[in-house]
């Protein structure tokens, strides 16, 4: 059980890391850490899994190209703004409602469902994420909290039940729209940093789902 809980902590940290990338632009200082040995080792570790390797390689390639980009932080911040903060017509808005909602507008049914899930779990999401509940960063932050909450359980059968709920969340709240989101990133993210992050997130969700199902 202790091994499972230790692995849960790693899983939660990875989802929180993804959440941070979709929550806001990277600062100059944050971007510098992506060229550090620590982050590169973390990415290399993820890339040791064959199912994650292509997306990790794309992300590392984008990071390497960033080092040759003039005003890299400003350019990447502009990419973030163009992709995630402007219009659905020319970007990839990171809200589930834009992909699986009925109206094609923000704050549709997916946002309501997320609000209910959060209330039912009694899980607080990072208060700095001032976004509708179906924003990708909010959903990933919530999933990390779900995983950590399960570490309070002591019986194996209860952990198995928690795994079922986590997998349901991945399938229903994330994989139901992430592929469409990634397609939009592919269409509009010319440099490819955020596209590679989206592709890595999808690959990780698939891998994590297989783990939760015991495959």
UniProtKB/Swiss-Prot annotation:
GO BP, sorted A to Z: protein complex oligomerization; protein folding
Primary subcellular site in the record, as a coarse category = cytoplasm
A single Gene Ontology CC annotation of this entry is: cytoplasm
Q: Which UniProt keywords apply?
A: Chaperone, Cytoplasm
Question: According to its UniProt record, what is one Pfam family this protein matches?
Answer: Nitrate_red_del
Q: So which domain of life are we looking at?
A: Bacteria
Question: Which InterPro entries does the UniProt entry name for this protein?
Answer: Chaperone_TorD, DMSO/NO3_reduct_chaperone, HscB_C_sf, TorD-like_sf, TorD/DmsD_chaperones
Family from the record: Belongs to the TorD/DmsD family. TorD subfamily.
Q: What does this protein do?
A: Involved in the biogenesis of TorA. Acts on TorA before the insertion of the molybdenum cofactor and, as a result, probably favors a conformation of the apoenzyme that is competent for acquiring the cofactor.
Q: What is this protein called?
A: Chaperone protein TorD
Q: Give the source species.
A: Vibrio parahaemolyticus serotype O3:K6 (strain RIMD 2210633)
């Amino acid at each position: 059980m202790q091994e499972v809980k230790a692995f849960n902590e790693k899983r939660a940290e990875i989802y929180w890391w993804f959440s941070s990338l979709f929550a806001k632009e990277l600062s100059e200082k944050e971007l510098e850490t992506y060229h550090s040995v620590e982050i590169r080792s973390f990415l290399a570790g993820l890339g040791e899994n064959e199912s994650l390797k292509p997306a990790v390689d794309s992300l590392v390639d984008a990071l390497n190209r960033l080092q040759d980009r003039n005003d890299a932080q400003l350019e990447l911040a502009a990419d973030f703004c163009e992709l995630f903060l402007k219009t659905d017509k020319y970007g990839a808005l990171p809200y589930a409602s834009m992909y699986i909602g009925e109206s094609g507008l923000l704050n549709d049914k997916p946002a309501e469902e997320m609000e209910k899930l959060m209330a039912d779990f009694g899980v607080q999401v990072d208060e700095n994420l001032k976004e509708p509940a179906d924003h990708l960063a909010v959903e990933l932050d919530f999933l990390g909290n779900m995983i950590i909450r399960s570490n309070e359980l002591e019986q194996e059968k209860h952990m198995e039940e928690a795994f079922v709920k986590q997998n349901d969340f991945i399938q229903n709240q994330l994989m139901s729209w992430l592929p469409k989101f990634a397609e939009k990133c592919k269409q509009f993210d010319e440099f490819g940093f955020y596209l590679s992050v989206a592709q890595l997130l999808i690959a990780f969700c698939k891998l994590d789902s297989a783990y939760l199902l015991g495959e």
